[in-house]
Amino acid sequence: MVLESTMVCVDNSEYMRNGDFLPTRLQAQQDAVNIVCHSKTRSNPENNVGLITLANDCEVLTTLTPDTGRILSKLHTVQPKGKITFCTGIRVAHLALKHRQGKNHKMRIIAFVGSPVEDNEKDLVKLAKRLKKEKVNVDIINFGEEEVNTEKLTAFVNTLNGKDGTGSHLVTVPPGPSLADALISSPILAGEGGAMLGLGASDFEFGVDPSADPELALALRVSMEEQRQRQEEEARRAAAASAAEAGIATTGTEDSDDALLKMTISQQEFGRTGLPDLSSMTEEEQIAYAMQMSLQGAEFGQAESADIDASSAMDTSEPAKEEDDYDVMQDPEFLQSVLENLPGVDPNNEAIRNAMGSLASQATKDGKKDKKEEDKK
């Protein structure tokens, strides 16, 4: 088995936001890096893998380590920003490989390029010659911007391979298919051993052989199960919300119908008593029932007469009250006292005195007339 130390260079430029690889270039790259890391560590437990970004000053996320979990945790913190500097990233990866612990390990760089390479072809060829001299192999996954980068990257890889034509690889992946699937079937992983060699993602569930990497297969299965449960929960909530909206009108109608039914029953129970079957009653029972009905009728009649007397008393009291008010208003002395208390009114005014005099004479005439009528009676 080959002992190898590998530095994985990931593209974290703004171009990785594009969705030509589902769901985005960045997430498709994460899946592919996951496969690369597990393939390298599975082929030989002593193999080491490191991680570096090509944008934002080419930051080394993890140094060489056999711990794939640490690498993947750092990988998922990468956010797209800026532009890549391909040559600088490859130089930093080469420097990290020089500090590997196992000096007998072969050196390899796997670079994911998903944005335009701005370095000119001359600089790329010069860098490739230096890496060939240092016996460093470079595999490049060219995706997303293959029309711009293919020519430059082909010259870079051909310079690395030299006359032998082996050791380094360039894999160009067109938009559409899964980046991870294309990588599995590519020559980059050929000869590394393990169950994933020569297999497509469709040969095993999630593209991983459970017997070769049970932990990864279990993690993928748990992730898919959680996603399925979330989707089912969202669908259940949406169905419940729509059912609740549709049931509001029906519930209101049922409630009103129930209330009407209860009201009808209560009216039937309390407002109207059922008539007894007289044919099934004895003569004594019929006499007792007749006496009871007559007593109820008498009570009802007394209540009605009391209501009538009360209403008639109210009617007779109202005219008497009106007559008392009229007599008070016709009293000259009362009016004179009222006028004296009103502000701005002069009781000695000639017009007011004439009006009061006519009112007094009218009251005298009415008094004499009432006296004559009483004498006649």
From Swiss-Prot:
Region (Disordered), start-end ranges = 224-255, 300-327, 341-377
Name of protein = 26S proteasome non-ATPase regulatory subunit 4
Which Gene3D superfamilies does UniProt cross-reference here?
Answer: 6.10.250.380, 6.10.300.40, von Willebrand factor, type A domain (3.40.50.410)
Q: Where is this region: Interaction with UBQLN1?
A: 197-262
InterPro entries reported in the protein's UniProt record: PSMD4, PSMD4_RAZUL-like, UIM_dom, VWF_A, vWFA_dom_sf
Q: What taxonomic ancestry is recorded?
A: Eukaryota, Metazoa, Chordata, Craniata, Vertebrata
Q: According to the UniProt record, where is the region Essential for ubiquitin-binding?
A: 216-220, 287-291
Tell me which domain of life the UniProt entry assigns to the organism this sequence originates from.
Eukaryota
Its keywords, alphabetically, are: Isopeptide bond, Phosphoprotein, Proteasome, Repeat, Ubl conjugation
Task: Note the subunit structure.
Answer: Component of the 19S proteasome regulatory particle complex. The 26S proteasome consists of a 20S core particle (CP) and two 19S regulatory subunits (RP). The regulatory particle is made of a lid composed of 9 subunits, a base containing 6 ATPases and few additional components including PSMD4. Interacts with NUB1. Interacts with SQSTM1. Interacts with UBQLN4. Interacts with UBE3A. Interacts with UBQLN1 (via ubiquitin-like domain). Interacts with DDI2.
Q: Which of the residues bear the PTM Phosphoserine?
A: 256, 266, 358, 361
Find the cross-link Glycyl lysine isopeptide (Lys-Gly) (interchain with G-Cter in SUMO2). 122
Source organism per entry reads: Homo sapiens (Human)
This protein's gene is called PSMD4
